[in-house]
Amino acid sequence: MIMLYDNPNKTSHFKPFEELTITDDFMFGVVMSEPSNLKPLLESILNIKIAQIHYPERQKVIDVTYDAKGVRLDVYCEDEKNTVYSIEMQVTDQRNLPKRIRYYHDMIDLNIIDKGENYKELKKSYVIFICCFDPFGTGRYMYTFKRQCQEEPGIFLGDETESIILNVNGSVGNINSELRSTLAYMSGKTPDDGYTKTLDKAVKKVKENEKWRRDYMTFAMKMKESNEVAVLSNIISSIKRVRDKFTEQDMLLIFGLSSEQLSAILETIDANPDMDEWEIANIILFR
């Protein structure tokens, strides 16, 4: 195992547990793991009535889910019509929302196909991001995306996928009063209706729970590890591209690595030619 950073806390920027709000990934996941909290939110976003929702993998609702590309932090549920919903908070603009949305839709479909279902059985799906920023800069509360013909705008593909991005600081567009109050609460304002007061009480209840405090520490540790893997996998990708063009001494300067770190990376690359950067980074950091 090698240390990627001289200061092991360099990638740790997690709030103290007591300071968490509904917009923090962990708190959002815990609060929304209760159907009575999540169902009204989905109903207000989509302007529909949902009879009931359930979580296919209940134990993973607020877990940090690792996959080949990193970490998923979404709340995943289905309703009585087998419609799938993936909803996530996004506090900072990482400028990757379109690709992240595409990836989530793909994962929803692959999860069904991996179980042996025919593609005709693919479920209607919504991927929803609630953002503490305006990704498109128009001031809208909501941006809704469906696949549509460019030549004939009135023709929709009808693949039953829909993507929605919400802006908690929005002021443009017509949304229902319930959703407006919810977005205002998520932007930091005082809860002003029954639902937001329920959410606020749920947040306070989580903070009083020692189990959730311990789980948050585990969550923070896993996120720190994932961040380190992401950084190192990018370095490994770059090293693979340039190692034939530069000396090892040059690469030490280019990538800001120690001799031990660079040697470990090169040795692991050579020993595992079939592994991708993410797998190699995990070996280097945690072997």
Q: Which residues does each PLM region occupy?
A:
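Accessory alpha/beta interaction modules
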Residues: M1-E162, V172-N174, E225, R287
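Short, charged alpha-helical interaction segments and adjacent helix-coil junctions
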Residues: I2-E18, F26, Y85-Q90, S177-R287
